[in-house]
Amino acid sequence: MRDLKTYLSVAPVLSTLWFGSLAGLLIEINRLFPDALTFPFFSF
C-alpha cells in the first residue's frame, strides 16, 4: 500500500514537469517560427 501511495504522489509531479516542458518547447518553436505550417528544418 505504501508503494501505491508513493506511485500516486510521483506520477502527477512527473506528468506536470513533462507537459510543462513540452508546452515550453512548443511555445519556443512558435516564437522562432511563427505561423509555420511546414518547418524548414524538416524539409528534405
From Swiss-Prot:
Signal peptide: none
Subcellular location: Plastid, Chloroplast thylakoid membrane
Residues spanning the membrane: 7-27
Disulphide bonds in the chain: none
UniProt keyword annotation of Lipid metabolism present: no
Main location: plastid
GO cellular component, one term: photosystem I
Membrane-related topology note: Single-pass membrane protein
Keywords, alphabetical: Chloroplast, Membrane, Photosynthesis, Photosystem I, Plastid, Thylakoid, Transmembrane, Transmembrane helix
InterPro entries, sorted: PSI_PsaJ, PSI_PsaJ_sf
Biological process per Gene Ontology, one example term: photosynthesis
Family per similarity comment: Belongs to the PsaJ family.
Purpose: May help in the organization of the PsaE and PsaF subunits.
PANTHER family found in the cross-reference section: PHOTOSYSTEM I REACTION CENTER SUBUNIT IX, PTHR36082
Name of protein: Photosystem I reaction center subunit IX
Lineage: Eukaryota, Viridiplantae, Streptophyta, Embryophyta, Tracheophyta
